[in-house]
């Protein structure tokens, strides 16, 4: 008697990089150039990581002093505003620790001083996962993602992860200061046009938007025609379609 074969369903190719295969993390370090960069790139994923029990720490490299429209506003005032906004935004996502390195906004370059300071943060917080900017200019996406500060932070962070943070012979003064070498397991780079690892943020998209709205100096400017809620939902919905979710963020996932 002939038997009917049961077809084995294959998971769609777009889902093969889904977060169902991501390990649990105890400590996560998010290294970004400016206040509001973490939320735009990975706010939903970081809220999810925090909900799952990870201790997520932000490292904001610049002072955010170029993120304003009024040339008469004092730098010190804008810096203070942006730091308050960043702390408030982080709290919405369940993130309690925010470190500010204080580099001048718009003046970053990938150099040894920046690498050393990021290595110090990695050795201090000992993350298993680091999230940071893409270290290369992307020509098929809006230019905002390829801000020169983003490129500098992305490249410096990648170099800090490997080889510097694990190498006892790199930045030896850090050893004397008590910062022992540390090995990072993974790096995630937000990459919304060409990401191949999708994190389902359907349950955290509202948290992401609430966090972004704390950056009032950036998303609620008088006369602005930009609807951040509409823009973010569309972008993360489009990414979600690729990953098989209602809303998603996409990353390049690198095993160190």
Write out the residue ranges for each language-model feature.
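Metal-dependent de-N-acetylase/amidase catalytic core
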Residues: 2-29, 112-256
């Amino acid at each position: 008697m002939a038997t009917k074969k049961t077809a084995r369903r294959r998971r769609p190719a777009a889902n093969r990089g889904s977060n169902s295969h991501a390990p649990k993390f105890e400590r996560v370090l998010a290294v970004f150039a400016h206040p509001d960069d973490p939320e735009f790139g990975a706010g939903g994923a970081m809220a999810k990581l925090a909900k799952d029990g990870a201790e997520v720490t932000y490292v904001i490299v610049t002072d955010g002093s170029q993120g304003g429209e009024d040339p008469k506003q004092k730098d010190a005032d804008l810096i203070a505003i942006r730091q308050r906004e960043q702390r408030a935004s982080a709290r919405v996502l369940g993130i309690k620790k925010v470190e500010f390195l204080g580099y001048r906004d718009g003046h970053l370059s990938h150099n040894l001083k920046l690498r050393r300071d990021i290595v110090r943060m990695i050795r201090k917080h000992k993350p298993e996962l680091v999230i940071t900017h893409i270290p290369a200019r992307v020509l098929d996406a809006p230019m905002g993602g390829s801000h020169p500060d983003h490129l500098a932070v992305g490249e410096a962070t990648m170099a800090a992860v490997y080889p510097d943070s694990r190498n006892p012979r790199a930045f030896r003064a850090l050893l004397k200061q008590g910062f022992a070498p540390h090995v990072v397991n993974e790096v995630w780079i937000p990459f919304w046009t060409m990401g191949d690892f999708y994190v389902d943020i359907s349950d955290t998209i509202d948290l992401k938007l609430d966090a972004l709205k704390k950056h009032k100096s950036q998303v609620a400017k008088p006369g602005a025609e930009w609807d951040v809620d509409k823009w973010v939902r569309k972008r993360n919905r489009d990414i979600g379609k690729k990953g098989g979710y209602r809303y998603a963020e996409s990353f390049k996932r690198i095993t160190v």
